[in-house]
Curated annotation (Swiss-Prot):
Recorded GO CC terms: cytosolic large ribosomal subunit
Membership in a protein family: Belongs to the universal ribosomal protein uL16 family.
Keywords: Ribonucleoprotein, Ribosomal protein, RNA-binding, rRNA-binding, tRNA-binding
Molecular function (Gene Ontology), one example: tRNA binding
GO biological process, one term: translation
Role, per record: Binds 23S rRNA and is also seen to make contacts with the A and possibly P site tRNAs.
Name of the gene this protein is made from: rplP
InterPro entries attached to this UniProt entry: Ribosomal_uL16, Ribosomal_uL16_bact-type, Ribosomal_uL16_CS, Ribosomal_uL16_dom, Ribosomal_uL16_sf
Family matches, as Pfam families: Ribosomal_L16
SUPFAM superfamilies: Ribosomal protein L16p/L10e (SSF54686)
Quaternary state and interactors: Part of the 50S ribosomal subunit.
Species lineage: Bacteria, Pseudomonadati, Spirochaetota, Spirochaetia, Spirochaetales
Organism (species): Treponema pallidum (strain Nichols)
Name of protein: Large ribosomal subunit protein uL16
Amino acid sequence: MALSPKRVKYRKVQRGRVKGDATRCNAVDFGAYALVCLEPFWLTSRQIEAARVALNRRIKRGGKLWIRVFPDKPYSKKPAETRMGKGKGSPEYWVAVVKPGTVLFELMGVERALAEQAMLLAGSKLPIKTRFAERVQEI
C-alpha cells in the first residue's frame, strides 16, 4: 500500500529546503497517542509504510491508527553512470516533507503502555529521531 498521489499538476518539482518548526499538524487531534518527529526530513512512502506495518503488527488490530503525513513531493533521480546535463532526471519515488514537531502517526483504543511500545517500534523503522506524545486534555 505504498502511498502516492493519484494525479499531480506538475510531474517534477524543485527540491526546496525544510526550514523552521511545524506550525501545522503539530497537535494530537484525532487519537489519544502520537509519534512526533524531532528532525527535518523527507520521509519516503516506503518508510511510512514500514512504520505503519510495524505499528499494526504490535497493536494486533486492537485500536484505530491515523497516518498524518502523506508523500506528495516527487523525488527525481538520474540513472546510474549518466553524465551531467541533459535535463532533470525522471521521478523515482514520493516523499513527505516533515518539519520538527510534525505528528506522523496517531493511535487510539489501546492501553498507554502498548501504545508507547508500538510507537517506539515504529520510530525505530524511521531514519529520524522521534518521540511519543499524548493528547493534552483541555478544560
